[in-house]
Structure formats: C-alpha cells, structure tokens
A protein has these predicted regions:
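Helix-to-loop junction immediately C-terminal to a conserved catalytic motif
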Residues: 48
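Short beta-strand immediately N-terminal to the Walker A/P-loop
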Residues: 30-31, 81
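ABC ATPase nucleotide-binding domains
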Residues: 78-80, 84, 88, 93-229
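Conserved ABC transporter NBD signature motif
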Residues: 56-67
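The feature captures the beta-strand-to-loop junction immediately N-terminal to the Walker
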Residues: 33-35
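ATPase nucleotide-binding modules
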Residues: 226-260
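Conserved structural motif at the start of ABC-family nucleotide-binding domains
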Residues: 2, 17-19
Length: 260
C-alpha cells in the first residue's frame, strides 16, 4: 500500500532522515513515534506530496509517487491529511471546508457518505457553522471528515489530538479508529505519545537519528525492546551495568544470556 525505500532528506544541510525504509499494508494503522525533530512529520509531508523527495523512493499502490526525479502532486496520490492545527478555512462554512477543491461531480458522488460520517460522529448540525464557532474537538472531527471526502486509501495524521484535553482526546481517538477500521483505510499516525501509539496502532515504528530503531507490533516493542532508547518510550526503566562474557552478561542481579 505505502512503501518507503532508503529515504534520505535534509534541511539546510542538516540531515533529518537517513536511509529510512518502512512498509504500511492495506487497512493497517501504523504510528511513527520518536522525539521532536527526528523526522516524523517530514515523512508525512514527503509521502503526501507536500514536499519533494531528495533521495530514495516512495510507492503508493506499487506506483512510484516520489523519487529524486519523480513527483506526483498531492491531489493525485489518493491520500488524505489531518493536520495538527486542523487547518480549516475560517471564511468557509464547515460543509464548504469539507468539499473544498472538489468538483461538482465528486461532491455529488460522495455527499451521502460524508453526511453519514457527520451523523455518525455527531457533527451534522454544524454543517452551516464557521470554524470559530466550533470547539477544538469539533474542528478536529471536521478535519477528519474533510480528509475522507475524496475517498482516500491512506490518511496521514499529524499529531491530531495534541491540542485536546485527555477526556476529549479519548473520544475523538475512539471515533477516528472506528472510522478507519470500518472503511478499511490505511493510516500513518505521527505522535510523541506512546500510550496513543499503543492504542491506535497495528504496528509502531520508533525513529532515532532519522531512521527506524525498531518496527513491530505494540506488544513486541513493549515486551521486547531492542535498546534502552526504545524501552524508555514505554515507561520508567532501571539500567544495570554488566560485563559480557561467553554469550552472557554478568550483573549485580545475576548472569543472563545475551539476546540474539
């Protein structure tokens, strides 16, 4: 569905991504987790076509959409994007925001689906209101519906809950996951919140220094972290010094076999 091959990218000679590779399957929700500045949002911008790729290759449905000499525009990639700040047009009504940029024939085709989605998440009564009349949670719900208006196969979610309080975050998160599952839409979520990643994801990719440190299921990363860097993302850890000898490590707690 979505494939990254050996992606490298820099801003003003500062390397952001370094030989990054990853694959997202149809219907999967994958989270990118990592510290600020590790390249998470840059990956979304490259995959969605907002930025041009410097080195490597990105495929959607097995077709190259980005490489050093190929760039398919965003509107031709069959993707949706939910921004951290919603990015709604303040001078347009909610319904106008949702259908912005779509042709009349596309609007007619998608109208019933969009209205059903709005009813499902309880925002149908907001159709004629303007963004400033909505709460932060309602604006984020509108942003999700807008991202789905063109019937995309992949949705990119850039820290969509970061500006919401914890109670509202849980509600919106549940709604979003339900809709993604119901419509079998793949999603790539950027977050710095490990709890959010564990709840939402089929797989998690932890980034460090511009590349994948570990990629796998939430339970895999939690129970079998490959490094202290990974373990620290999912809770407090105790670090013990030891010496390695004959395939085992000797610590104050005893001797343990080294993992392969």
């Amino acid at each position: 569905m979505l494939e990254f091959f050996n992606i490298s990218h820099a801003y003003n000679k500062q390397q952001i991504l370094n030989d990054f590779s990853m694959k997202l399957e149809l219907g999967e929700v994958v989270s990118l987790l990592g510290p600020s500045g590790c390249g998470k949002t840059t990956l979304l911008k490259l995959a969605s076509g907002i930025e041009k790729l410097q080195k490597g290759e990105i495929k959607i449905n097995k077709e190259i959409v980005s490489s050093s000499n190929i760039h398919v525009n965003s509107e031709k990639r069959d993707v949706g994007y939910v921004f951290q700040d919603c990015a709604l047009f303040p001078h347009l009504t909610i319904m106008q925001n949702i259908f912005f940029g779509m042709k009349s024939i596309e609007i007619e085709k998608q109208k019933n689906k969009i209205q059903s989605l709005m009813i499902e998440i309880d925002i149908s009564i907001l159709a004629d209101k303007y963004p400033h009349e909505l709460s932060g949670g309602q604006q984020q719900q509108v942003a999700l519906v807008r991202a789905m208006a063109s019937d995309p196969k992949i949705i990119f979610l850039d820290e969509p809950y970061s500006n919401l309080d914890s109670r509202l975050k849980e509600k919106i998160r549940d709604q979003m996951l339900h809709i993604l599952r119901e419509h079998n839409i793949s999603a790539l979520l950027v977050t710095h919140d490990p709890e959010e990643a564990m709840f939402m994801s089929d797989k998690i990719g932890v980034l460090n220094n511009g590349s994948i440190e570990q990629f796998g299921s939430p339970i895999d990363l939690y129970l079998r972290p490959k490094s202290a860097f990974i373990a620290e993302f999912f809770g407090e850890i105790n670090v013990f010094e030891g010496t390695v000898e004959d395939g085992s490590v000797n610590t104050v707690l005893g001797t343990f076999k080294c993992s392969k």
